Amino acid sequence: DTVCSIAMTLVSVSESILKALEKRFLESGHPSNLTLLHSCGQSDRKDGIQHFAHEGMVTRIIGSHWGLQPRWMDMIAKNQVDAYCLPQGQIAQLYHSMACGLPGKMAKVGLGTFIDPRIEGGKMNERTKRLPDIVDIIKYKDEEYMFYNQIPIDVCIIRGTECDEMGNLTTTEEAMKLEVLPAVMAAKRYGGRVIAQVKRVVQTGSLNPKEVTVPGVFIDDIVVCENPLEEHRQTSSWYFDPSYCGQARVPQENIPAASFNERKFIARRGAMELYHGAVVNLGTGIPNDMVGRVCNEEGISDDIMITVESGIYGGVQAGGIDFGIGQNLYAMIGHHEQMDYYNGAGVDITYMGIGELGEDGSVNSTKMGVRCTGAGGFIDITQNAKKVVFLGTFTAGGAKYKFENRKLEILQEGKIRKMVRQVAQLSFNGPMARKKGQEVMVVTERAVFQLVKDGVELIEIAPGIDLQTQILDKMDFKPIISKNLRVMDERLFVQDGPFGLKLKEK
C-alpha cells in the first residue's frame, strides 16, 4: 500500500496516528512493505514521519526533503529503503493532477538536475539505481518536459483543528494550509481511505462552511487526539500561538532581532540585493532564519513582500525546526497554490542555502557524501526565479570567525571545502541558468561571487581577508577575478542595532 502524509516540519503532523502505526508495527510486524509518499519533510528530528523509519515497515519512500529526519537519512544511506527524491512542488501539484484523473504531471521543473532521468532520476542510493524510473522525459511541440508519473494512493493521513459530526474538517488553528484537499481528492480517485486527526469534534452546523477545508464526505476515519499538548502541537517549539495562524498580531518591536554572527553578516549582505516592491522567497537555513529578521530590524519589511514555499506572505518567519510559518502574516494560501506561482511567474528574488559551488556555477544543496537532505522546494523555486542569491559560509565543518574593528578574522578554517571543481549532485544547473539569463549570486562571509558568461566571478572580498591564502587557496577551481573587485561594505560589521539597509530602486 501507498501511504500519503500531509504536513511540513512538525506543522500539521498527525502525530497520534503515526505513533499508533509505529507501535503496531513494532508489536506485530504490520503494516509492512509500505510506500511512503510525502511532498514536504515532516519531522523535527524526532517525531513526525520518523515513526515510519523502520526497515520492513516502509520499503519505498518518495519525498522531497529529509534534512530534519536523521533516521530516514541513515536508512537511505545504508540502502535499507528504496528512495526517490522529487521536487516538493511537483509532488504537491501531482496530487491535484491525480485528483483530476490525469496519468501524471508535465513540467519543466527538474530538467537538467539530478531529478532528470538522464542524470540520476531522483534515485538517492545504490539500491534504487537498479529500479525503474518514476519520471520520464517527454516532448511536446518540440520542447522537452519532465513527466511525473501518477503514484496511486491507498491511504491519506491529514490533520485539522476540528471536525463536526458529519466529518467536515477545518484547519483554522494550523499554521499552514498545505495541500490537504488535493491529496484527499487524489486518494479518493484511487478508492483510497482518508484518516484525519483533529483536536475535537463539534456539533454539525456549528462550523462556518467557508472555513471547511475538507468536506466530510471525503473523510473515512476521524481520530480525536487524546494528548494534544504532545501530539497536536501547532509546531515543534510550542503548543499554540494565535499569531502564527492569523488570529492575533504582535507588536513588531516584540519580535527579537537576530544575534550578530556570521549567519547574520551573510544575510545582511544578501539583503543588499533587495529593491522596492520585490517579491521574495526564503529557503531553509540562513535565508529563512535570518533574512526576514534582518528586514524587520532594518524597517523595510513592508517595502518588499517576503514569501515562503508553504504559502505564507509577509510577516516575520520562524526558523529552524519551525520552518514555513510566520507571525503577522498578510496572507496564507495553499502550498500547491504557492508552487503554481513559483513554477509559473517565478519570484523576483529567491534566497537559498548552498552546499557546494562548482566551477560552472552549478550548485549542490541536496546531497553531501552519503547524507541526502533532498531537494525540498529548492528546484521548483530556483529554476524559475528571476534572481537567485545563494547564502552560506565559504567552508563547512567547524569554521570560527571574529568580527572586530570592521574586519573579519578567520579563527579556525572549516574542514570541508564548498568551492569544488564539480558538484557531487546537480541541484542547480549553472549553464542552464546562464542560458536562461538568470541573475545568480553566491554570498559568503568572506567573498561574493556572481555567475557570468565565462563562469564564476569574484566581485567582493571582506576587509581583513587575504585574497590568495583565504579565498583562492581554499577553492578547487580558480574563479574569474573582477577588474572592479570591491571590499564589502563596512556597515555590515555593525553589531548592535540596524546597519542602515537602503533598498535599491527596480
Residue ranges and their predicted role:
Residues 9-25, 35-37, 42-52, 57-251, ...:
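Conserved phosphate- and dinucleotide-binding cores of soluble alpha/beta proteins
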Residues 32, 256-259, 264, 268-275, ...:
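Glycine-rich phosphate/ribose-binding loops and adjacent secondary-structure elements
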Residues 1-4, 245-256:
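Generic N-terminal amphipathic, Lys/Arg-enriched alpha-helix
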Residues 275, 491, 505-506:
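Non-catalytic interaction surface on structured domains
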Residues 498-506:
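Long, compositionally biased
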Residues 1, 31-34, 59, 277-278:
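Nucleotide donor/acceptor-binding cores
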Residues 3-24, 40, 280-293, 297:
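Glycine-rich N-terminal segment of FAD-binding domains in flavoprotein oxidoreductases
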Residues 27-30, 77, 300:
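Short, structurally constrained coil/turn elements
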